[in-house]
Amino acid sequence: MLRWTVHLEGGPRRVNHAAVAVGHRVYSFGGYCSGEDYETLRQIDVHIFNAVSLRWTKLPPVRPAVRGQAPVVPYMRYGHSTVLIDDTVFLWGGRNDTEGACNVLYAFDVNTHKWSTPRVSGTVPGARDGHSACVLGKIMYIFGGYEQLADCFSNDIHKLDTSTMTWTLVCTKGNPARWRDFHSATMLGNHMYVFGGRADRFGPFHSNNEIYCNRIRVFDTRTEAWLDCPHTPVLPEGRRSHSAFGYNGELYIFGGYNARLNRHFHDLWKFNPGSFTWKKIEPKGKGPCPRRRQCCCIVGDKIVLFGGTSPSPEEGLGDEFDLIDHSDLHILDFSPSLKTLCKLAVIQYSLDQSCLPHDIRWELNAMTTNSNISRPIVSSHG
């Protein structure tokens, strides 16, 4: 029984950020917020959410080891990707309005909170943003995105073997997925499932004739072939800047945006790779408002969703509107315990808590007390 159980405000106000779950913590890297200064080059920020205490903290800036020498830290960016392999977060790609796109690989040690730039070899992908990254064993797969130097969408697959730090351009077989950016790619078993994103009628070139495909594409990492997939009778609307995650061998997507429909989404869909069918899921409880560019991470049997941007309630739902960046966080519980359901009842009906054990009262307080690290809200146009 899926249920939205927690809704808190006051976290990092971020859009197009990237995040990974490490145990009961979620590490969020970069992104942007309307109204902030992005002309000045600065270090990427790192926020950590504790899924037990339900509190956010922000890591302090990295100080240079040698005075006068800049520390090895990625610059602030958006549209990048992060993956976790063992105790290391690998951050790749993304762009900044001053520096442009980047193709330097950064490694973040979750134990020491130190950054490094591993020495890599092979065919390094061109700098880009809006790509996807997913992991199979020690290998990170990069697909798609918008390449800065070529000034076009990509449908290439690159893989990085982190045991040898070698990049390879994968020579794929079969009919490849269309060029796109701000899609999702999720690894289930040995298969990478690509959904959504923004494509163009003119193939790799951006002409503002956008396409939002809602067919799922599957890449087999063993044969390095794009598979021919059957058509499905029920499909979610095509979208970009949505979230996707795998749980118990199935693929879920949430939210996103379709410019041709002038619509933001807050729907949840489940894809079963065995039957190759989609099903719309209606969780209990109050979920997030329609949005795009948010982050989703799996922590145990829970999904932690935070940030993103939505049209202002005073505006229409078209592509020309004021956007409001979010500092909220929502938790979707796949199997809420009886204890969790009881706490939700206490909150919903404002029941007396004085007779409850101290630890339960502490948990109730955490579930209802907002964080306080977000910036004041600023709306942006576009």
From Swiss-Prot:
One of its GO terms (cellular component) is chromatin. The keyword Repeat applies. The keyword Disulfide bond does not apply. It is found in: Cytoplasm. Its main location: cytoplasm. PANTHER family: KELCH DOMAIN-CONTAINING PROTEIN 3. This is Kelch domain-containing protein 3. The lineage of its organism: Eukaryota, Metazoa, Chordata, Craniata, Vertebrata.
